[in-house]
Curated annotation (Swiss-Prot):
Record's catalysed reaction(s): pseudouridine(1915) in 23S rRNA + S-adenosyl-L-methionine = N(3)-methylpseudouridine(1915) in 23S rRNA + S-adenosyl-L-homocysteine + H(+)
Biological function: Specifically methylates the pseudouridine at position 1915 (m3Psi1915) in 23S rRNA.
Main subcellular localisation: cytoplasm
Species assigned in the record: Citrifermentans bemidjiense (strain ATCC BAA-1014 / DSM 16622 / JCM 12645 / Bem)
Similarity field: Belongs to the RNA methyltransferase RlmH family.
Gene name for this UniProt entry: rlmH
Residues annotated as binding S-adenosyl-L-methionine: 70, 102, 121-126
GO cellular component, one term: cytoplasm
Presence of the UniProt keyword Methyltransferase in the record: yes
Lineage: Bacteria, Pseudomonadati, Thermodesulfobacteriota, Desulfuromonadia, Geobacterales
Official protein name in the record: Ribosomal RNA large subunit methyltransferase H
Length: 154
């Protein structure tokens, strides 16, 4: 299985980039990981921005990729539940598991309809920059759970 992370806009803060690099490196010990950025839309109405950003994200999804949205409306999961989700996808032969983080105005309904699953990291509002690090850390944590490594504590 290959993992792809898609998000809108460049990572602005150096400390966020450092966190991304740290956890991306750890994840790559378990499987291939690719991070792709879709250009952020500026200067338009919210609906138009959302539409254009989702079009750009859609172009980055490989054919047959299983799309998972990070969305405030998504299903809340525990870390062990995410680990189970990752493990099942790997064991069932998913070639590309694609996690997408939307822009400031989220996803269009059409883009949401393409998703295999939608998950939420928190009921609180998180910045789109910080979600990148949180998602990577949770994916890494998931693989340590799968491999019975001493990182996650219950």
């Amino acid at each position: 299985m290959r993992l792809k992370l898609l998000w809108v806009g460049k990572t602005q803060e150096s400390w966020v980039r450092t966190g991304i690099e740290e956890y991306a490196g750890r994840i790559r010990r378990y499987l291939p990981l690719e991070i792709l950025e879709a250009r952020e839309e500026k200067g338009a109405q919210a609906a138009a921005m959302r539409e254009r950003e989702c079009e750009r994200l859609a172009k980055l999804i490989p054919k047959g990729g299983r799309l998972v949205l990070l969305d405030e409306r998504g299903e809340a999961m525990t870390s062990p539940e995410l680990a189970s989700f990752l493990s099942k996808n790997r064991d069932q032969g998913t070639q590309d598991l694609v996690f997408a983080i939307g822009g400031a105005y989220g996803f269009t309904d059409q883009f949401r309809s393409q998703a295999f699953k939608s998950i939420s990291l928190s009921r609180m509002t998180l910045t789109h920059q910080m979600v990148r690090v949180f998602l990577l850390e949770q994916i890494y944590r998931g693989f340590t759970i799968i491999n019975c490594e001493p990182y996650h504590h219950e």
